[in-house]
Regions:
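Amphipathic protein-protein interaction modules
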Residues: 49-105
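Intrinsically disordered or highly flexible coil/loop and linker segments, enriched in small
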Residues: 25, 83-86, 116
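A structural signal for well-ordered alpha-helices, especially hydrophobic packing surfaces
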Residues: 20, 74-81, 111-115
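Generic structural concept
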Residues: 9-17, 71-74, 100, 104, ...
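Short terminal alpha-helical segments
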Residues: 1-53
Length: 116
């Protein structure tokens, strides 16, 4: 099995978990999305990170210390990821997903507001 420690997907998962600790909003569609789009071995971890969606979708003020983490998440989603060796993974579906397009757009808007 491939070592995932340096994989950018795991990097994002870990950052999202950090963010999720401060938010308790539950998003049912997050669980549905990950079960269809992530490899089974990391889907469970991702489901625990619904706070990432809460931060990107809600209108709450983002703490200054969170801005850099959000920026890294956005940059990671934009980059051409190294695909993991798992036939279940469908990076293209994530790339083309309206759900993730909206998360990227919301995150950009929130970061722009922080700069004003």
């Amino acid at each position: 099995m491939k070592d995932y420690e340096n994989n950018c997907y795991i990097f994002i998962l870990n950052l999202a978990k950090e963010l999720a600790q401060d938010y308790d909003i539950q998003y049912q569609h997050m669980e549905e999305f990950v079960r269809w789009n992530l490899p089974e071995e990391i889907a469970i971890e991702w489901i625990d990170a619904e706070g990432m969606v809460a931060i990107l979708e809600c209108g709450k003020c983002i703490p200054e210390e969170t801005v850099e983490i959000l920026r890294e998440i956005i940059n990671a989603f934009i980059l051409e990821f190294e695909k993991i060796d798992n036939p279940v993974w469908t990076h293209e579906s994530m790339n083309r997903s309206a759900f993730w397009d909206m998360q990227r757009l919301n995150a950009r808007r929130l970061l722009d507001k922080m700069k004003e």
